Design a protein with these regions (language model features):
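Negatively charged
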Residues: 16-99
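Sec-dependent N-terminal signal peptides
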Residues: 4-13
Length: 99
């Protein structure tokens, strides 16, 4: 029994978040910012909190924060090396001023 509980505890502590891609990107952002529109600290997201998201498989971020005037999350740790499209990503995201 102890061994089973230990294995379960290790599994839960090392569980990874759901992968983001173009297929679920828009829905993930919408869901997260519905509960935490300023900082993206959506603890209920299957992807974790927005500043920690693994966006390495996202290709198109066009318009992601468009018209989200209060958005100001720190997304400086995102790996956007595979993103090709960022048109109007921060259009009218007036409060966004992170480095």
């Amino acid at each position: 029994m102890k061994k089973t509980l230990l294995i379960l505890a290790i599994t839960l502590s090392t569980a990874s978040y759901s992968q983001l891609s173009d297929d679920n990107w828009s829905a993930a952002v919408t869901q997260c910012l519905a509960t935490n529109p300023i900082d993206g600290l959506c603890t209920n997201s299957p992807h974790g909190i927005m500043p920690d998201w693994d966006v390495s498989n996202v290709d198109d971020m066009s318009g992601t924060f468009k018209n989200r005037s209060t958005f100001n999350a720190d997304i400086s740790n995102w790996d956007v090396s595979n993103v090709r499209l960022m048109s109007k990503m921060f259009y009218e995201a007036d409060d966004f001023n992170q480095p």
